[in-house]
Amino acid sequence: MSERDYAPVWPVPERTSVLADTSIEIVRPRAFGQVPKHALFDFDGTLSLIREGWMDIMVPLLTGHLLPYAKSDETPERIVSLVRNFVTELTGKQTIYQMIRLAEEIRLRGGVPADPQAYKAEYHAALMARIDSRRKGLADGSIPRESMLVPGSLDVLAALRERGCAIYVASGTDEPYVLEEARLLGIDAYAAGRIYGAQADHASFSKEMVIQRILKENAVDGAALIAFGDGYVEIADCKSVGGIAVAVASDETARSGKCDAWKRERLIGAG
């Protein structure tokens, strides 16, 4: 099952409301037929900030691979813009999809690309070099967990658990790293045995598959599901089965707790 592409299907409303005494924006009010008993969370950017800054690694790396194949009328600036646009467009899907797109762009320009998995491995090595100190600091306690979490993450997880809600995590990051980083952040205490990530065979995993598994194994319909995410995939997938979608328009860089305007518009469009 392939992952859906981004397609804005909902307009951004001119007016919304805010839940009293919170910064939670209510974009589309709805009546609750039942209290959700299954909560699905995206990982990076929704709960974890360990990989904050990943785009600053990916865009230059992919640009470097595509530049040698630029057409005569394509300036370096135009290639950078192209790469940034498709990386942004595919954010929320598994990393391999951005590498597949790179290979397609090289092929369109008459080049012979490497295997997308090779590009992914190169990117991942560069990213791990950037975040290694964060992971080590979390492991030895020199970096507090709170500094690598989206503000309020553990409070939300604890509140859901107290209300009898089963918690799941699904990420486009490779599963072994999601498991390890969830442990470093203390998230595994809330979702043990229910943390999923990308597989070597990318076609064998998607967030839609995780949602269908939750519904099937628990014999419930989509109304029993609530999903939290800063990516369009989990928002659109949750809405497609009738669940409640909570967009997390997180400011990853400053960790300010304020809304990221670009994420907000994109997530509202997704549902």
Q: How would you name each of these model-derived features?
A:
Residues 84-146, 151-162:
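A metal-dependent, Asp-based hydrolase signature
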Residues 195-202, 249-255:
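Short, acidic/turn-prone active-site loops that include or flank metal/cofactor-
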Residues 6-81:
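Active-site neighborhood of HAD-like aspartate-dependent phosphohydrolases
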Residues 154-162, 215-216, 235-246:
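Surface-exposed amphipathic alpha-helices with a cationic face
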Residues 46, 58, 142-148, 153-183, ...:
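Substrate-recognition element of Asp-dependent hydrolases with the DxDx(T/V) motif
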Residues 205-238:
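Conserved Lys-Pro-Asp/Glu-containing loop-to-beta segment of HAD-superfamily phosphomonoesterases
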Residues 171, 227-271:
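Acidic, Mg2+-coordinating phosphoryl-transfer loop and its flanking beta/alpha structural elements
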Residues 185-199, 258-271:
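Structural recognition of alpha->loop->beta junctions
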